[in-house]
Amino acid sequence: MRRFAHKFVLIVLGLGVFALPSWADTHIYAGALGTNQNDQLFFSNGGGFDATASSYALPQILRTNGLNTGYYRGDALTFSALAGTIPNGGPILGHAAFGSRLAVQVVSVTGPPGGSFAFWEGDGESDLGNITFSVPVGTTNGTDYLLISENNGEPGADPYGHFHGREFTASAPGTYIVGFRVIDLSTNGVGGGPIQSPSDILPVRFQAGLRIETIQTFTNRVTVSFRSPPAISNVLEATSAIGSGTWLPVAGPLRGNNNLQFLTETNPPGVNRFYRLRLLNNLP
């Protein structure tokens, strides 16, 4: 069995500078640019997650216990459909047409060779312990989807939906970019088709496994940046000889928060230096 104590990322600092190229329960909201026939769906806050416009990544760590053992998973990511009625917390500007039934489709996946990106359905509180669908790296025209509207497609129904207990995982360490699209599954449009047209594809970056994103050297300190899921404590360790097996903690521990964070070693010796991040705990 793998042990989380051996999971770390490594960076080497020689003479000079060497660099390797908060949201909790994160929500991405789906709605529409209009409510007439063929008006386009969209992700209302998608700009904050667009991998082409930002370096932001949703961090995932290898789970060593619980339902997702053996897979990389981060904090919960929830896709929600904006409400159109008062009982569901609406009307919210940008909601889809009444009678639409929204789903999020996984269209494309890039990432490490042999890897895959999977969706786990939930019961409202936690995932059900089985992969609902898995999309391999290299996919460019995926059709798998998860329903996000809490209706049955009846005419006039509120498109609202907010499901908890769902999870997304990666099967191998590395950086993934997953293309998501909102589609309308209803048959309440012209000719028995959907009301709304599909959204543009939103590319979202996931980082499976701890990774030092940047390293900066100053006169009296070295600072590294990284991302980690909430409730995971991380420590920066260093050694002057990688073959010695002697790693000493030099900064932290620091609990993750899904956002870019920093750990700093002050007054490091002016010699070759090796760094790694190590997580101190794991979650189910």
Over which residues does each language-model region extend?
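N-terminal secretory signal peptides that target proteins for export/translocation
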Residues: 1-6
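Short, hydrophobic beta-strand segments
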Residues: 166-171, 265-267
